[in-house]
Amino acid sequence: METGVPHRPVLYQEIIQYLAPFSPGRYLDCTAGAGGHSKGILEASAPDGQLVALDLDPDAVALARATLAPFGSRAIVIHASYTESAQVLAEIGWQKVDGIVLDLGVSSMQLDRA
C-alpha cells in the first residue's frame, strides 16, 4: 500500500457543489476510496458535519482512515460494502442522512494494482 493519497477524486468540485454540505449535516460516502470526496464533504460541513465512509477494499479503508484522521470523531470509516449501508447506519444509530455519494467508477488506484 502506498503512503500518499494515490487517487484524485473525479468530479470533486461538482460533487461538493451539488451535495452542498452544511453543518451539522450527516453524510454517507458509500465508496470512500482514499477519502478525497469524504474530506471535501467534512471540510464543507465544518464545524459539526459528520460522515460515514464505507469501502470494501481494506487498502482503501486504511487510506481513508489516514486521510480523515484530522477530523476526529466527525469521520467514521468502516470496512463494508455500500450494499450494507442501511445496516451500518442502523448499527451506529443514524436514522437519516443529508446526502449520499456513490462514486461507482473504477479508480486509477484499482487499475494500478490490477
What feature does the model see in each segment?
Residues 1-114:
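S-adenosyl-L-methionine-dependent methyltransferase catalytic core, i.e., the SAM/SAH-binding region
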